[in-house]
């Protein structure tokens, strides 16, 4: 993404699809411009931010207002041609300066509240995901300098109504929308063109001389590889939901080692032989966990608790409480077995490894020691 212009379209079946930007980018831009306005004490009508993917956005500011040491500003969400429930709505930020030296971030009207475990945010907190939290706080800190403090409130008056058209309630996020986005950019997810762009990245890596590749579902996997494995992320390629397709492409290109790295919420599906991990295609996460826990001799009580969970992260808490953390090594081995079964007709199949990690970047399990895998990747 960082190598492509934001204005460059995504092509699908001869049609140019326009990119958009996330609610996280809107909240970041709104917070930044509100902080600048309260400092300068004059209205600002346009603001620029650099997204986590390195793309610079120049956005129009709506409803700017200053009152003493407080300012409010809004950015209108634009989903491009990947229009979702939040497209066109205003995301507001209210910034109030203080002398605390600290930045506090809260969610106001129309921002959902987390009511269930399993999405990586504390119960009762605003549904502002980790990457947007970081970008909002960084943008405000850059604006106000190192000594001042600020209270930042993100709100969206249409949020509660718009959220009814999302999956938030199923995830235990109630009362509004989520502020999300790991890259800051919305790319139209036309499947074939998206798959081709991912495959093209594999081709570029192979052409550069790489023979070992790390496939991750998204940005969190790349961050884990960098921070916890100490491996050059040059070998990392995003596979999105297209696990089987990307494995087959890696084999076609002659990679000798494929390492699958991700959260169990995605990779556990591979253990069940599901190689397209989008929930619209198949979702057997709890069933797969229950089956493999049973194979390891887990009690019926644990099987019932896990079977009733809505998210893998929530199930993991029960698994830890019952002392069955060794299931993750078991699942990693099963994932590799499923991959090798898929490639059973391949003349020279690659080495396959799998590493599972938690939302807080801790290693949960692997088919063999992670240090051993990392050492091979550095060869």
UniProtKB/Swiss-Prot annotation:
Asked if Transferase is a keyword of the record, the answer is yes
The metabolic or biological pathway listed in the UniProt record of this protein is: Cofactor biosynthesis; adenosylcobalamin biosynthesis; cob(II)yrinate a,c-diamide from sirohydrochlorin (anaerobic route): step 6/10
The enzyme's main class, written as a single word, is transferase
Q: Does the keyword Heme apply?
A: no
Give any GO molecular function from the UniProt entry. Answer: cobalt-precorrin-5B C1-methyltransferase activity
Please give the biological process terms from Gene Ontology that the record holds. anaerobic cobalamin biosynthetic process; methylation
| InterPro entries noted in UniProt | CbiD, CbiD_sf
- The organism's superkingdom is given as Bacteria
Under Pfam families, the record lists:
CbiD (PF01888)
Keyword line = Cobalamin biosynthesis, Methyltransferase, S-adenosyl-L-methionine, Transferase
EC nos: 2.1.1.195
Q: Reaction catalysed by this chain?
A: Co-precorrin-5B + S-adenosyl-L-methionine = Co-precorrin-6A + S-adenosyl-L-homocysteine
Q: Which family does it belong to?
A: Belongs to the CbiD family.
Which protein are we looking at?
A: Cobalt-precorrin-5B C(1)-methyltransferase
Q: Which organism is it from?
A: Salmonella dublin (strain CT_02021853)
């Amino acid at each position: 993404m960082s190598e492509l212009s934001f204005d460059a379209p995504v092509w699908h079946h001869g049609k140019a699809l326009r990119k958009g930007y996330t609610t996280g980018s809107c909240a970041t831009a709104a917070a930044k411009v509100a902080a600048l306005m309260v400092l300068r004490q004059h209205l600002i009508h346009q603001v620029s931010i650099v997204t986590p993917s390195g793309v610079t956005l120049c956005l129009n500011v709506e409803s700017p207002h200053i009152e003493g040491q407080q300012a409010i500003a809004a950015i209108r969400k634009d989903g491009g041609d990947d229009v979702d429930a939040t497209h066109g709505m205003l995301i507001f930020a209210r910034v109030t300066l203080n002398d605390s030296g600290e930045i506090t971030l809260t969610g106001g009207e129309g921002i959902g509240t987390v009511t269930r475990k399993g999405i990586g945010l504390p119960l009762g907190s605003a549904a502002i995901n980790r990457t947007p939290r970081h970008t909002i706080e960084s943008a405000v800190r850059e604006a106000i300098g190192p000594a001042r403090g600020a209270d930042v409130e993100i709100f969206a008056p249409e949020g509660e109504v718009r959220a009814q058209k999302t999956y938030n309630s199923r995830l235990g996020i109630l009362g509004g929308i989520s502020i999300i986005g790991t890259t800051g950019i919305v790319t139209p997810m036309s499947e074939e063109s998206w798959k081709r762009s991912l495959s093209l990245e594999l081709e570029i890596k192979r052409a550069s001389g790489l023979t070992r590749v790390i496939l991750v579902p998204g940005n969190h996997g790349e961050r884990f590889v960098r921070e916890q494995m100490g491996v050059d992320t040059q070998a990392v390629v995003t596979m999105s939901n297209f696990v089987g397709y990307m494995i087959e492409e890696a084999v076609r290109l002659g990679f000798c080692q494929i390492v699958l790295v991700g959260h169990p919420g995605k990779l556990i599906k591979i253990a069940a032989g599901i190689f397209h991990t989008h929930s619209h295609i198949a979702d057997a996460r709890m069933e797969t966990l229950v089956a493999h826990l049973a194979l390891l001799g887990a009690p019926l009580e644990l099987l019932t608790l896990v079977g009733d969970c809505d998210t893998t992260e929530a199930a993991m808490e029960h698994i830890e409480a019952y002392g069955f953390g060794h299931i993750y090594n078991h699942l990693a081995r099963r994932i590799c077995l499923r991959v090798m079964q898929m490639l059973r007709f391949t003349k020279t199949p690659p080495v396959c490894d799998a590493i599972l990690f938690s939302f807080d970047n801790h290693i949960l399990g692997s088919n063999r020691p992670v240090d051993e895998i990392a050492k091979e990747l550095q060869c």
